[in-house]
Amino acid sequence: DAEFPVCNAEKGQFGATFVSSRIDGGRIVSWSGAEASNAIPSQSICELAIAADELPAPVENAERLEITALENGHAQIFAHGIGGHASMPEGTINAVGLIVTYLREAEDAFDARDERLLTPAEHEFVKFLAFVHADAYGRGLGIDATSPAFGPLTCNPGVIRVADGHIEQVIDVRFPDSTSADTICEQLEPLVGRFGVTYRVGRAKVPFSVSADDPAVKALIDTYNEFTGKHAEPFAMGGGTYARNFARAVSFGPEETGLELPAWGGQMHGPNECANEEQLKQALKIYIVAILRLNELEL
C-alpha cells in the first residue's frame, strides 16, 4: 500500500467538522464536495435559492465555474477542480474552494448595489470558509506547521453539506511531529470564535516513525538500492498504512514513483489501477533478499 524505497514515518491525522450557526430561510439549499474526507474534490455543486440570471458572472476561476438555471427556478453553481489525495495537495484544485471564492465575489457585487445575497449566518460561515480554503497547508486557519523529518502539515476541506439547518465543512489534516491534535484545537479557537462556528473532532492519530538508523530500516533500504542501483533514502508521507498498527514497522513498496504507465492505466488507488510486470518481478526479488536479511537481525 505504498512506494519504494522505505516509508519510515507517517504524519499524524486529525479530522474535524466545522458547523455554522443555525440558518433559517437561507439561500444555500444544498452543497456537495468530496465523497470522503481524504479526497480533494474534483467537483462541487451548490444550489442557491435565487434565479440564475440574478447572479453575476464569475471573474476569478471563470473557466472552472458553470452557473445554470434549474427547473425549480433556483441557480446551480458547478465547479470543476483537480482532485487528489488529501495528503498530497500539490497540483490539485479544491472545487469547494472555487465556489467559496465565487460566493465571496457575488456577495461583493450584491453589496455594491446595497442588496444581500446570503443571510447573516450564511455570510459569516462563507467568510470563515475563505480562511479554511486559503491554501492546502492550514495557514488560513492558523494551524500550519512543518518539521525536517515529516515536512509540512496539509489540510483538506473536502466534504461539505447542508444538514438540519446548518452548513458543515469537514477537514482532513495530516500533521508533522512539531505539532499535535491538542495544539491544533487550541489554534482553531480564535477563528471559530470570531465567526461563531462550532466544531467537533473526529479522528486524531499521533505521528508514527521508525528511525532511519534502525538496523531493519537499513537492511531494507540497502537491499532496494543494491537491486536498483539507486542511492535512495527513507521518506515520510501523509498517507496511512497498516505499519502504524505495530510498534516497529515500515511500509516497503511495491510501487515505484515516476513509473511510466500505459495510456489506459492508472496509479495506485485510482481508476484502472495497473502494475508493471517487470517492476513487480524486481520487487519480488527485493522482498526475498530483504526478508532473508531481516531474519538475520535481532529484532
Task: Describe each PLM feature range.
Residues 1-176:
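Midchain, well-structured core segments that form catalytic/ion-binding scaffolds
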Residues 29-30, 36, 41-43, 51-64, ...:
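Active-site-adjacent substrate-binding region
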Residues 40, 44, 95-98, 153-156, ...:
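General structural feature for long, well-ordered alpha-helical segments within catalytic domains
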Residues 51-64, 98-109, 113, 187-196, ...:
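Generic non-transmembrane alpha-helical segments
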Residues 77-85, 168, 198-203, 264-271:
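A short small-residue
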Residues 89-92, 113-118, 203-212, 273-276:
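Short histidine-centered catalytic/ligand-binding loop motif
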Residues 161-239:
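Substrate-recognition/cap regions that form aromatic- and gly/pro-loop-enriched pockets
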Residues 163, 222-297:
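Zn-dependent metallopeptidase/amidohydrolase metal-coordination segment
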